[in-house]
Amino acid sequence: MTVAETRARNLSIPAPSQITRPALEGVKETMVLNMGPHHPSTHGVLRLVVELDGETVVDVAPDIGYLHTGIEKTMESKTYQKAVVLTDRTDYLAPLSNNLSYVLAVEKLLGCEVPERATVARVLLVELQRIASHLVWLGTHALDLAAMSVFLYGFREREQILDIFELVSGARMMTSYFRVGGLAYDLPIEFDAAVEAFLAIMPGRIDEYEALLTDNPLWIERTQGIGAIDSEAAIALGLTGPGLRATGVAWDLRKTMPYCGYETYSFAVPTATHGDIYDRYLVRMAEMRESVSICRQALQRLRDIGPGPYMTLDRKIAPPPKSEITQSMEALIHHFKLWTEGFKPPRGDALAAVESPRGELATYIVSDGSAKPYRVHFRAPSFVNLQSLPHMARGHLVADLVALIASLDPVLGEVDR
């Protein structure tokens, strides 16, 4: 068939709008689409069962469990000290927040007092972790919407934070640096200069990110008015973190239920009004600026405090210092028994909640008086926030679903645990 004949044949075929199908008139058809679990936009092994009318989302059902590791059950077979390393593996983008929530709960059970130097160091490190986590969110969110430059810039600054974590703990992500009663070891001498260098450049880098996105017409087109939720629905669905604050609710545990002395720091709780993807973006960008401010205050406090204890002096909880272990057989025996048998909190339960980068993270521990927890449960913000996805997605295009997932910033290790 010649080109001319092919064109003539194609022109003779009626357009789809001219084809009548009487049997289907008035019948609404929908399609069920499986999105994931292996899909880059789901930010992990998340499967979404999406019902579509054309390209419009009628409903969506998250299907979770592909990354279940049984961390809560595994912790029941570990002593309280050894369980710290497992908390890193839930929200692997903010492991220090998980460490903090867990050790605060155990310290409540024990009635343990933590040295001021350790408390201030905890605040400084979790705020650096918040910035690092938000940088991953920003880079991947922008990449999902085809803004690749922001992804590269964000990971440039995140690398600097991970270098600080490596300097402090020897690990870049799974730090396991917080201990029941304080810190694993003291901050190194180089820590002050490394943090100061990062804080000096970070405000300007946030300006760069905002210059690329905030007034970008394509970014605005893909985010403004998409996935909006009001405060009443957000509260009913248990939404916390930037998602809740984007609806106008100034709920931040660092202010409303302060821990680690957050009530003594000066910072604002960023909020917005429309509750859409764009507002969630604005809230997180403002949060990074507030975290920089908190880090500056904490760094100055560390300078004012100077060298001092970084671990509780209660020998029933903390091992003897290494200087004693090398000189005293009794200290060596005590160290051995503490790490092999563990300490035994009194019977009871304790709950400790912190404001993680994704929202309200809580650890609930039940003690039966033994050296191992009877039950550990995490209130994971990613798990709770994910249930708001169907509410936000209905009526939007399937392409908007990609942006919606990114705006919730879920971590599947925390969802499935």
Swiss-Prot record:
Catalytic class of the enzyme: translocase
Recorded catalytic activity of this chain's protein: a quinone + NADH + 5 H(+)(in) = a quinol + NAD(+) + 4 H(+)(out)
EC number: 7.1.1.-
InterPro entries according to UniProt: NADH_Q_OxRdtase_suD, NADH_UbQ_OxRdtase_49kDa_CS, NDH1_su_D/H, NiFe-Hase_large
Topology in the lipid bilayer: Peripheral membrane protein
Molecular function as annotated in GO: NAD binding; NADH:ubiquinone reductase (non-electrogenic) activity; quinone binding
Subcellular location: Cell membrane
Keywords: Cell membrane, Membrane, NAD, Quinone, Translocase, Transport, Ubiquinone
One term under GO cellular component: plasma membrane
Function: NDH-1 shuttles electrons from NADH, via FMN and iron-sulfur (Fe-S) centers, to quinones in the respiratory chain. The immediate electron acceptor for the enzyme in this species is believed to be ubiquinone. Couples the redox reaction to proton translocation (for every two electrons transferred, four hydrogen ions are translocated across the cytoplasmic membrane), and thus conserves the redox energy in a proton gradient.
PANTHER family xrefs: NADH DEHYDROGENASE [UBIQUINONE] IRON-SULFUR PROTEIN 2, MITOCHONDRIAL, NADH-UBIQUINONE OXIDOREDUCTASE 49 KDA SUBUNIT
Family: Belongs to the complex I 49 kDa subunit family.
Subunit structure: NDH-1 is composed of 14 different subunits. Subunits NuoB, C, D, E, F, and G constitute the peripheral sector of the complex.
Protein name per Swiss-Prot or TrEMBL: NADH-quinone oxidoreductase subunit D 1
Species this chain originates from: Roseiflexus castenholzii (strain DSM 13941 / HLO8)
